[in-house]
């Protein structure tokens, strides 16, 4: 899968990017929602993983932009955050996000989620080809 990862924490961004590449994915990195928006003007992706709280264009506003103004409106979207508190969960719920994973969750959690999303995308592609 081609995955866009968006996070203002450069260290996390680099580690996540390398991790996903090791698992066979093509990865595009962006340091905030504004940069990610520019990426989507040029690239089609299969999955977006975005931090919730970032400068310039936060995850919630970036998610809204993706859903309303891009060809990526139906692309699965995972919010990630180092915060796992009530405020963060409210932002996630209010954003009508597909998935949320805490940055403190075991790496296997995100791997399983990405694998499940990839499997669902493959099944949809097969179903579309049949019709």
Predicted regions span which residues?
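The C-terminal output helix
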Residues: 115-131
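Active-site beta3 strand of CheY-like receiver
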Residues: 43-49
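Two-component/phosphorelay signaling modules centered on CheY-like receiver
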Residues: 10-28
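Conserved phosphotransfer cores of two-component systems
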Residues: 41-43, 67-74, 95
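C-terminal output helix
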Residues: 87, 105-114
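Receiver (REC) domain active-site loop signature in two-component systems and cognate sites
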Residues: 54
């Amino acid at each position: 899968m081609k995955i866009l990862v968006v996070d203002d924490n450069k260290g996390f961004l680099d580690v996540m990017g390398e991790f996903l590449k090791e698992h066979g994915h093509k990865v595009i990195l962006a340091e905030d929602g504004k940069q990610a928006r520019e990426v989507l003007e040029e690239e089609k992706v299969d999955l977006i993983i975005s931090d919730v709280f970032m400068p310039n264009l936060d995850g919630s506003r970036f998610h809204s932009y993706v859903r309303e103004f891009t060809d990526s409106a139906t692309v699965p979207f995972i919010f990630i955050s180092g915060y796992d508190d009530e405020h963060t969960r409210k932002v996630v719920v209010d954003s009508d996000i597909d998935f949320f994973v805490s940055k403190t969750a075991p790496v296997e959690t995100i791997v399983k989620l990405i694998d499940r999303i990839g499997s669902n995308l493959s099944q949809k592609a097969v179903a579309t080809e049949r019709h």
